[in-house]
């Protein structure tokens, strides 16, 4: 984007040099790639008035001109331009002057006639041929308006200017316009931005009487509007407008087309102007193209369209390729009198695909691709109406013909001063922060310590709190952020943190139990994103995933661990024991960063012990997996409890939730037989723990106790109970009545079958008693044992 300083001053006034402005803009995030000075290498360039022109006596292609350059007498200049003529105001390089390329102007004789200066073309003063009006491509430049001879020609041409070239990143589409840049500059210098005039004197005639607009697919075209201007006069644009277009890299054509391009650069809103009489209908229908449909664009090329393309039609025939290029038969020509001005919002993806496929890149398509500001769509059309009325003698019809919805002009985001200060290291007051947002043109609402920032649609790069924090840092000044030393809760001298130590300890426990550590992808398929999830929350999906298998961020580590086990088993490695410590992700509200939680998961399948010498095998089972989990809890000095549960994807009768301090922190269970079969796995057991929750409870030290000086006692008890009663319920009853001498319990046998009623099972439990202060007696233990048995009988158990 090329930003003219002379043009920028129309919206914002600052007392600073262009070089300082460019430096400041670069420091705040928009790189100024180049600074173009149109006065560089130019000296003694003035406006001249050609008083007379005579043919050169000795050269057919040369003319001898008498030119008034504001001095006492006219000077004689020999000129070879085919379009030079008496009565013209022209650009003159005086004797002693300089032009780009090191050209020095001297007195000379051309075929015997003296020449005291040079009548210049735009190319000769450094303007690229690509941007010069076609009428001056092969001759000198002629002013379309009367000038004062002898005045500075660069000032008369509005080229006494410096232009900044922005190297924009895709997120800063707002700076693809003069107004967007003016907002940025106003914020940097804490000044006000003045918007241009948009109000026209309207006729009583309504555009609704001459035009209708219909959108067939609002997903691709959310909004389309049109205004009508009658009786325009096609002529060259004013010099100032032509100069601004040239400095922005656009060739001036005529006042109507130039106004369209001017407003595009001013607001960043692409417009299209149709010859109303050439449309051939009072209907404008916006639809997707028919497969194989053809149209000829403004570059005289016939295009074959696809259904993915969006076209503007007169109800039958395409008159424009939406957002990319107009059609040839409705273009503005010299005889055009009545204009229809289009202002619309088109789907960025559709515009990108169409422009890429047809190799049609334009100023309009590049802006539609990045997304445009809804707040400027109608305002830009109104601005074009005002300019057509002012510079093309147009008569503006009242009312706007539209279809669809513009959408929200603002996006509210809540933030606090504390959040900003903690993130950046500032100490700004709430008023300071609100002032910065107001400098940026963002309205704010304050409710206690919460600042609600109303972000305008032109700033599509601001969607979350962190974006607002960046804006505060940019405008306040990155260089002004105070240097501070990092603050730590606890400083360690080159040693592991408590969490690092405990994580390493857990890994050693699991590796010692025969499990291998795995590291899997954080991305899973959308179907697997919520599988085994302990929190039923919204998933985080990629907008453009590389494959369907990696389309969402995981909420569990198990889907990929199951894949890893299946992969190994398919390659004859049938005994698989893996664990992983990794992050899972849960979405928050729109504009909020997701929660990132560290989990610990494991999977075991096949044989746990293979003794080839004796031929004995121990197959992985629930209790083996539970033993691994219990070993983790012991190492972290935690106490888990288990509660029967039903979890999708796990065996309904062999699954339990893992509780810590009465809160669910994980689960353990056998993989559902159907899921196991789908992955060619035999009986497979998995567990998953919220590792962050464990770390939050686990203390960073181990409590040591003396070795008991007195012997303990063990009693076994066999209970016949209903098969649906979990052992955990029985153990809970035992511990509730065991007093302070019952140290632990162990289920060592479960039996169902012969000699038991149907629906019953026998559970054998060992109870270990110990008193650390004195030797236990049989009488004391028996008394406690009797209380326990009575409680179990009351629970429905039969003592065997």
UniProtKB/Swiss-Prot annotation:
Its EC number is 6.1.1.20. Residues 39-154 form the tRNA-binding domain. Its cofactor is Mg(2+). GO terms for cellular component: phenylalanine-tRNA ligase complex. Binds 2 magnesium ions per tetramer. Residues 708-800 form the FDX-ACB domain. Belongs to the phenylalanyl-tRNA synthetase beta subunit family. Type 1 subfamily. This is Phenylalanine--tRNA ligase beta subunit. It comes from Staphylococcus aureus (strain COL).
């Amino acid at each position: 984007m090329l930003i003219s300083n002379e043009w920028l001053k129309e919206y914002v006034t600052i007392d600073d040099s262009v070089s300082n402005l460019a430096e400041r803009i670069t420091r705040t995030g928009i790189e100024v790639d180049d600074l173009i000075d149109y006065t560089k290498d130019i000296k003694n360039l003035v406006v001249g008035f050609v008083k007379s022109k005579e043919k050169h006596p000795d050269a057919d292609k040369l003319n001898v001109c008498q030119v008034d350059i504001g001095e006492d007498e006219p000077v004689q200049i020999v000129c070879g331009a085919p379009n030079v003529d008496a009565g013209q105001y022209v650009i003159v390089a005086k004797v002693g002057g300089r032009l780009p390329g090191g050209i020095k102007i001297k007195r000379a004789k051309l075929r015997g006639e003296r020449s005291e200066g040079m009548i210049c073309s735009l190319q000769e003063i450094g303007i690229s041929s690509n941007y010069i009006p076609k009428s001056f491509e092969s001759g000198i430049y002629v002013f379309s308006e009367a000038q004062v001879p002898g005045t500075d020609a660069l000032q008369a041409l509005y080229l006494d200017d410096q232009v900044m070239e922005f190297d924009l990143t895709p997120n800063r589409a707002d700076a693809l316009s003069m107004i967007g840049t003016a907002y940025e500059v106003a914020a940097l210098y804490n000044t006000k931005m003045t918007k241009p005039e948009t109000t026209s004197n309207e006729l009583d005639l309504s555009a609704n009487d001459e035009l209708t607009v219909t959108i067939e697919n609002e997903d691709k075209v959310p909004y389309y509007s049109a205004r009508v201007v009658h009786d325009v006069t096609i002529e060259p644009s004013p010099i100032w407008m032509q100069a601004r277009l040239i400095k922005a890299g656009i060739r001036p054509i005529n006042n109507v087309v130039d106004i369209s391009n001017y407003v595009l650069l001013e607001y960043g809103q692409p417009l299209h102007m149709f010859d109303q009489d050439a449309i051939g209908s009072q209907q404008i229908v916006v639809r997707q193209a028919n497969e194989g449909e053809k149209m000829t664009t403004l570059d005289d090329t016939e295009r074959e369209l696809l259904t993915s393309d969006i076209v503007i039609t007169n109800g039958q025939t395409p008159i424009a390729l939406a957002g990319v290029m107009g059609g040839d038969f409705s273009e503005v020509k010299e005889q055009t009198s009545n204009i229809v001005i289009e202002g619309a919002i088109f789907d960025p993806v559709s515009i990108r695909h169409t422009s890429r496929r047809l190799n049609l890149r334009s100023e309009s398509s590049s802006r539609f691709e990045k997304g445009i500001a809804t707040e400027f769509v109608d305002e830009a059309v109104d601005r074009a109406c005002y300019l057509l009325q002012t510079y093309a003698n147009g008569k503006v019809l009242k009312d706007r013909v539209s279809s669809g919805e513009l959408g929200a002009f603002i996006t509210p985001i809540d933030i606090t001063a504390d959040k900003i200060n903690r993130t950046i290291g500032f100490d700004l007051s709430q008023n300071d922060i609100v002032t910065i947002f107001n400098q940026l043109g963002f309205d704010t609402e304050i409710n206690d310590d919460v600042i609600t920032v109303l972000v305008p649609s032109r700033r599509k790069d601001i969607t979350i709190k962190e974006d607002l924090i960046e804006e505060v840092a940019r405008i306040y000044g990155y260089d002004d952020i105070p240097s501070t030393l990092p603050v730590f809760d606890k400083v360690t001298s080159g040693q592991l943190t408590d969490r690092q130590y405990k994580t390493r300890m857990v890994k050693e426990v699991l590796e010692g139990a025969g499990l291998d550590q795995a590291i899997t992808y954080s991305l899973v398929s959308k179907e697997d994103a919520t599988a085994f999830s302990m929190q039923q929350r919204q998933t985080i999906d990629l907008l453009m995933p590389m494959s369907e298998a990696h389309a969402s961020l995981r909420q569990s580590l198990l889907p990929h661990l199951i894949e890893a086990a299946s992969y190994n088993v398919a390659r004859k490695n049938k005994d698989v024991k893996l664990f992983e410590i990794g992050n899972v992700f849960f979405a928050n509200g729109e504009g909020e960063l997701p929660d990132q939680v560290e989990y610990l998961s494991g999977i075991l399948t096949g044989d746990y012990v293979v003794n080839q010498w004796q031929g004995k095998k121990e197959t992985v089972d629930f209790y083996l997996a539970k033993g691994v989990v219990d070993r983790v809890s012991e190492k972290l000095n935690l106490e888990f409890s288990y509660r029967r549960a039903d979890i999708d994807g796990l065996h309904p009768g062999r699954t339990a939730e893992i509780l810590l301090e009465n809160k669910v922190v994980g689960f353990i269970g056998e993989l559902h037989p159907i899921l196991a079969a789908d992955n060619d796995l035999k009986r497979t057991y998995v567990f998953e723990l919220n590792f962050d929750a464990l770390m939050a409870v686990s203390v960073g030290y181990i409590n040591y106790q003396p070795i008991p000086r007195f012997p303990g006692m063990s009693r076994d008890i066999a209970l016949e109970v209903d098969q649906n009663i979990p052992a955990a319920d029985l153990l809970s009853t035992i511990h509730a009545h065991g007093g302070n001498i019952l140290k632990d319990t162990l289920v060592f046998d479960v039996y169902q079958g012969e000699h038991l009623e149907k629906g019953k099972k026998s559970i054998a439990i060992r109870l270990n008693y110990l008193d650390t202060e004195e030797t236990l007696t049989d009488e004391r233990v028996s008394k406690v044992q009797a209380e326990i048995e009575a409680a179990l009988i009351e629970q429905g158990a039969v003592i065997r």
